[in-house]
């Protein structure tokens, strides 16, 4: 998901997105552990997407607290 799309979501939407990405990352880690994952770069991109979503979530919470 693009950062502009993430910035348009509210706090609940961002929390849901983080949770969904974490579930996907867990599934990928299990596939890697059982040697079913062929494209291991998806682990890195998923981990970075989680970090991106968490960063925007924190920014949104701070921005709402300042208002």
UniProtKB/Swiss-Prot annotation:
This is Large ribosomal subunit protein uL29. SUPFAM superfamilies: Ribosomal protein L29 (L29p) (SSF46561). It comes from Polaromonas naphthalenivorans (strain CJ2). InterPro entries: Ribosomal_protein_uL29, Ribosomal_uL29, Ribosomal_uL29_CS, Ribosomal_uL29_sf. Pfam families: Ribosomal_L29 (PF00831). One of its GO terms (molecular function) is structural constituent of ribosome. Belongs to the universal ribosomal protein uL29 family. GO terms for biological process: translation.
